[in-house]
Amino acid sequence: MANDVYASLGKDRKRFLNWQWRVIAVTMIGYAVFYFVRKNMSVAMPGITAEYGVTNKSFGWIIFAGSLVYGFSRFINGYLVDRVKGRIVMAAGLLLCALSNFLFGYGANLSALFTGVNEGPDFVNMFIMLMGVTIILNQYFQGFGYPPCARILPHWIHPSQLATKMSVWNCSHSIGAALAVVACGYIMGTMGTDMSQADGVVNTIIKNLTANGVDQAQAVEQAATYAAHIGAWKW
C-alpha cells in the first residue's frame, strides 16, 4: 500500500476505484460509438461509386474538407467543454452524429426530390453536394467526442497512472472502427435489392467502375456483386 496513490481515500478507496473504471468504460463505449458512426461512411463509398458513379476525387475532396472541419471542431469544442458539462456535449454530439448518418442514407432520395430526376448529371451533382454536407456535418459533430473525455478522465485518474489508463482507454478508437467495418461489411454483403439480373443496372455499374479507374475485367467481375445489393449503403 506504500505506493498506492489512492491510499489517502481510506474506506472510500474501493468505491472510488469502482467508479473510476466505470467512468473509463462508459467514456470508452461512448467514444467507440463516435468512431462507429464515423467509419461506417467509408465502407459505403464503394457501393455509392458503383451505383452512382461518384468518383474517388469527389470523395477525396469531401474527406479533405471534413478532416479540416473535424480539427476545427475539436478546437472549438475544447473551449466549449470547459464551460459546459462534458457529458451533455458528448451526448449531444452522439445524437447529432446519428442524425447526420440518417440524412446520409436519404441522400439519393433527397437528390431526386430536389432535382425531379433519379439519374443523370444534375441528380449526381446534387447527390454529391448533399453527401458532402452530411459527411462534413458528421465530422464537425465528431469533434464533440474527445474534448469531454479529455476533461473528465484526468479528474478520475491520478497523474502517475494517467498514461497507462489512457492507453487502455485509447483502445476505444480501434474497437469502434473494427465494429464499423464488421457490421457495415456484413450489411453491404447481405442487404439491399437484388438487381443482378437487370442488364441495364449491371451495365451502368460496369460503366461507373471503369470510369473510376477499375480495370474492365475487374469491373465486369464486381458488377454482379454490387448489383445484388443495390441500396445496401443506405443502411
Regions found by a protein language model. Give the residues of each.
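Helix-loop-helix hairpin linking two adjacent transmembrane segments in secondary transporters
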Residues: W169-W235
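Cytoplasmic helix-loop-helix junction between adjacent transmembrane helices
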Residues: T134-C171
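C-terminal ends and interior cores of transmembrane alpha-helices
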Residues: L95-V124
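Residue-level signature of mid-helix packing/kink "hotspots" within the transmembrane helices
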Residues: K39, S67-F75, A177-A178
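Extracytoplasmic
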Residues: R22-N56
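Cytosolic juxtamembrane N-terminal segment immediately preceding the first transmembrane helix
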Residues: M1-F36
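Helix-to-loop junctions at the C-terminal end of transmembrane segments
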Residues: S73-K85
